Amino acid sequence: DGKTKQIVKRVIGLPGDTIRYENDQLYVNGKKTNESYLKNYLTKFKDDKLQKTYSYNSFFQSLADKAQAFTQDANGNTSFTIEVPKGEYLLLGDDRLVSKDSRQVGTFKASQLQGEAKLRFWPLNRIGTF
């Protein structure tokens, strides 16, 4: 729509990185990387495909129900590789099944990044600083 929007996403890939996912496992430049911040989501995805988590939104429930993995590319592939261009960053939201991020809109230039999250206020049971 041409409007500027502010979003909060996690930087997954730095300029020049090769990011690869295989069935919810992240590899950065070929090195297996732990995404401990996703543990709660991954557990719930394996338990009930996030149906309770998304009980407030039937569309989100249907997306999760059809998903083969928690982290997929924009086409639903569970294994994919992204080459991060020089001077750009790969950003992903933690709620991967419904997040609009670099998988849909591409990488972000450094000039588009404005800050660093210091406080979490959602979910309510995890309010706190980083």
Where are these regions (language model features)?
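Soluble "head" domains of membrane/secretory-pathway proteins
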Residues: D1-F130
